[in-house]
A protein has these predicted regions:
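An alpha-helical, amphipathic repeat domain used for nucleic-acid recognition
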Residues: 1-194
């Protein structure tokens, strides 16, 4: 049956997609890792979803873990590099180590691959907290001094951003518009919120 303009709509031309086989699954995985920075766990989740959507043509269930490990051996997936890139991105946006840990846990990055990213988050903690404070107009970046209730809200916002309580309290307590010693602040919080 033809559409009123002479062409069948795409939804009427196609049937359901055929079930996947091992070669198609590998091609899907290659396309996915070529397009997105990903982890082994995220690749397994993606392939599991594709198999659920399209079905599996071969008899035995595919070994998705072996495929993810093979891609990691070939250097197509690197969980540690993903974690470090995520740490740099979040620090640049003003988020702290706890926010990083949550996102890496969701991405399926294990503790061994998180080490370098955690070290980077520790080193960038004060700078990231100041970026968040500047973006949210907290502490030295506020228009006016805060009352205790407003200061509590600032501290809560910084904690939700992944920063430790002591650092959030110190930054939110800085007087608005005044200069502060960045090096002294960095030295003070180098190890405390680790």
């Amino acid at each position: 049956m033809w559409h009123k303009n002479g062409v069948k709509p795409q939804s009427q031309r196609r049937g359901p997609p055929p079930p996947l086989n091992a070669e198609q699954l590998r091609e899907l995985a290659l396309r996915y890792v070529g397009k997105y920075a990903t982890t082994r766990a995220k690749l397994r989740q993606y392939l599991t979803r594709k198999i659920r959507e399209r079905g599996w043509a071969d008899g035995a269930a595919p070994d998705l873990e072996a495929l993810a490990v093979r891609f990691a051996e070939l250097g197509l997936i690197d969980d540690a590099a993903y974690a470090l890139a995520k740490s740099r991105t979040l620090a640049a946006r003003g988020y702290g180590k706890r926010r990083l840990a949550d996102q890496l846990r969701q991405a399926g990055v294990d503790g061994v691959d998180q080490a370098e990213a955690a070290a980077h988050a520790d080193d960038a903690a004060v700078d990231a907290a100041l970026r968040l404070a500047q973006r949210r107009r907290i502490g030295p970046f506020a228009a006016a001094a805060a009352d205790p209730q407003q200061r509590e809200k600032w501290i809560a916002a910084m904690i939700r951003g992944g920063h430790g309580f002591a650092l959030a309290k110190a930054i939110s307590g800085l007087p608005p518009g005044e200069e502060f010693d960045l090096d002294q602040l960095r030295e003070r919080f180098r190890v405390i919120d680790a």
